[in-house]
Regions:
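Active-site-proximal mixed secondary-structure blocks
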Residues: 1-39, 43-170
Length: 170
């Protein structure tokens, strides 16, 4: 399988489409343990003179524990709909108790410039190094959104990751 580096912005629309309609895989790694989860919220753009991918991870998630130890992550975007079942598994099970890669029949490939792996066969990959993070809180938050998404106080942490590599599998 060949890997072709791409300008990250060339596939920004695809990232947004897939993320908002079914999700994408976010993978982390620390202490020799890999994990992946399905995410459906985030943004892609340009900040601090760098390409940036912003993702959200709740503090209750196993991925949060790993990214706090190793501030790198990958996002694998399924170009085709072959990963619907795997996205369901990775969005509903915890990596603390199972190997989600095995459970969802996912193959991994080593990241090119970061420690976390990418999901083989998805087609599009973004590798990121965290440059800033911030925990959401009720302060200055729209009350309706706060009531809807954070009534249990399980806040997201926003991770602003510099995109250090973007590529497609061919």
């Amino acid at each position: 399988m060949a890997i072709t580096e791409i300008p990250y912005a060339d596939y920004a629309d695809l990232f947004i489409e897939k993320e908002s309609h079914g999700g994408v895989f976010l993978s982390t790694c620390a202490d020799g343990k890999n994990n992946t989860m399905t995410i459906g919220w985030g943004s892609i753009g340009f900040m601090w003179g760098k390409p940036v991918l912003t993702v959200m991870i709740r503090k209750s998630r196993y991925s949060y524990e790993l990214i706090e130890k190793n501030p790198e992550f990958t996002v694998s975007i399924p170009i085709h709909d072959d990963f619907k079942k795997a996205l369901g598994v990775c969005g509903s099970k915890s990596g603390r108790s199972i190997d989600k890669f095995k459970e969802a029949s996912l193959e991994i490939m080593a990241g090119q410039k970061v420690t976390p792996p990418v999901i083989k066969g998805t087609g599009l990959h973004l590798e990121c190094k965290v440059r800033y993070q911030q925990t959401l809180s009720a302060d200055n938050f729209n009350q309706q959104l706060c009531d809807k998404w954070y009534s249990d106080q399980d806040w997201h942490v926003l991770y602003y990751g510099e995109i250090v590599s973007a590529y497609v599998e061919k």
